[in-house]
Amino acid sequence: MALNNEQIELQNKINDFVNSDKNGFFGVLGGGGTGKTFTVCQTINVEDALFLGATNKICSVLKKYLTNNGYFKFEVKTIDSFFGFKIKKDHNNVTVITHKKPNLSKVPKIIVIDEISLINDRSFDLLMEIKDKRKFILIGDNLQIPPIEATPTRDKNGFKVSKIFTQLDYSFELKIQNRQKIESKLFELISKFRQNMDKSFSYIQMIEKYSNGNDILYYDINDKELKNLIYNKNPIAVGYKNLTCLSFNWLIGSTKFNDKGYKVNSLNVGDTVFFDGFYKRDKDVFYTSEIVNILEIDNFCEETIKIGNEFATYNFKKIKVKNENGIDKIIFVGNGYKNTLYPISYRVTKQIDKLKKQIDNSSNVKYKWILKNKIAELNTEYSNIKTGFATLKKPYAITAHKSQGSTFEDVIIPIYDYAAKVSQDSNQLLYVAMSRASGRIIFVNNKSNFKDNSNRYSFTQMERNSIASYYDYKCNVCQIDLEDLRDIDIDHIIPLAFNGTNNIANLQPLCKNCHKEKTKSEKHNTKTKNYATTI
């Protein structure tokens, strides 16, 4: 594919930078689908450059892109790997990260970093230390969502950005979009939205203006046409909140299989699933959002391991999958916390409690240090064990944060999910969701939505179903089957009176009896709390 005029101009700018005697940061900016990586690879000698990615997923996508475009001799690493990051847990179970400076004598003079919007503050500080020693070509979109930091960095328009965008020595922005058809309404919508993201405006009015029944659709959550579309096509919902994504996982799955009792966590031979987090066991590694096909399932495997001075027996699933490269792998999946991680966690906690008592009873500083190291080793070992059990999800819904770097033909956007106190923040999230679509956006509204901190809320049938489905339609206390939705009460694990919230981690399905008993206990505790505050 030939470069367009804009890309040729960028190519000339990059050549001027590469051939100059100056080092530093050259930013190649622009929205998704503008050909940033393509232009860079058409300009530099790929074999004489080092490619870095902010995450494992980016590196995986980058390797695939380079291979598919006829490049074979290239080097791709994560920024963490480049700086020799090591992650451990200390005696307080706090993550400790160490690093070392790279040997620059072995590093090419050109370093290309893709998706720089995902560079965190820690990596930024290290890159700044070698900024004047190499020529960096930094590829990214400043309107994508940056990593969450304690103190976010905002640009002059109020958007959250990675700090690296504030330190570019040279930059060029590509504006001609290639992902969507240029003459399409979808292209016009995403382009106009990007140009006006610094403003606050009504999403509903925008959708009603651009909806055309073709590549921009607009439905209510209960619309039959929405369900027909889900049944006949393969859309993916991109939401903001985890509960919304869980609800759409259930809605899409139950619609496709015509099963109101559909279980969102069920895994079956033939399923296509994606990893909902980083997985590493021995040499097998899978990254968040990586897709595999399930070939075989062994539902009950048992194993005994030694952790510290104790033995733990646990059970799990062994699943044979085929990855996107056609390679078969065996991965481990838990059979629920109680059956898999709890037997290990219990023995780790037991040993740590014993070591802590020894620390408290000792006055020997060196001995205390030895004991704290033992605790740190146990915490690190348990953390590594947890990483060795995969969380697999059906590819029906994903959060906007996790969707970055992906492209889907049909994207469902639950528009009611995108709201924030700062309009720039919700605009950034919505922009990420919309720019995932290559063919069509299906906006969905739901007048019964709620806020995380709302004190009263009647859950919709879809939400009740999705929460019950997440727990395999069982009461989370007594474990009896809940086959009729009328028998299910959705409960806040931490009551709203004690600052609990309406998010998925704090919601559980209970049978009527268990909910009644829990409510009695909560009323007593609330009275005690109120009494205590008036003394």
Q: PLM features: residue spans?
A:
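Conserved helicase motor core of P-loop NTPases
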Residues: 3, 8-36, 40, 133, ...
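C-terminal accessory regions
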Residues: 39, 307-452
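Inter-Walker segment of RecA-like/P-loop motor cores
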Residues: 50-107
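Loop/turn-to-beta-strand initiation segments
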Residues: 108-110, 133-137, 441-442
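Walker B catalytic acidic pair
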Residues: 114-115, 140-142
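The −1 position to Zn-ligating cysteines in a subset of zinc-ribbon hairpins
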Residues: 405, 474, 489, 510
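Short, charged surface segments at domain edges that flank catalytic/cofactor-binding sites
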Residues: 449-479, 501, 505, 527-533
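Histidine-centered nuclease catalytic patch
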Residues: 479-509, 522-525
